[in-house]
């Protein structure tokens, strides 16, 4: 069972992207629980589709901010350019 702390972090991240004007269909935030070396590990996967020209300027500061603020087990960000996403 995913902890309330991890769920709260995931919701905050989703709300941050929505506040920045990224539509709901371009954001995916998923929490998963697994076992690693006999202990429970919670992972948050964040996938965001944004315009290609905004990748460097937008993505890097957000990843740095959340990596410093939270010490959850694993926090994965994946930013896809809208050009690449349309080709998939």
What do the predicted segments below correspond to?
Residues 48-88:
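C-terminal basic regulatory modules in eukaryotic proteins
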Residues 14-55:
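Amphipathic, interaction-prone secondary-structure segments
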Residues 1-11:
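A short, highly charged nucleic-acid-interacting micro-segment common to nuclease
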């Amino acid at each position: 069972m995913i902890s309330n702390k991890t769920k709260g972090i995931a919701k905050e991240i989703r709300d941050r992207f929505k506040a920045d004007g990224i539509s709901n269909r371009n954001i995916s935030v998923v929490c998963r629980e697994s076992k690693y070396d006999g202990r429970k590990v919670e992972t948050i996967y964040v996938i965001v589709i944004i315009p290609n020209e905004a990748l460097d300027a937008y993505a890097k500061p957000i990843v740095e901010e959340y990596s410093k603020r939270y010490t959850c087990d694993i926090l994965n960000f994946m930013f896809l350019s809208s050009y690449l996403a349309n080709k998939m």
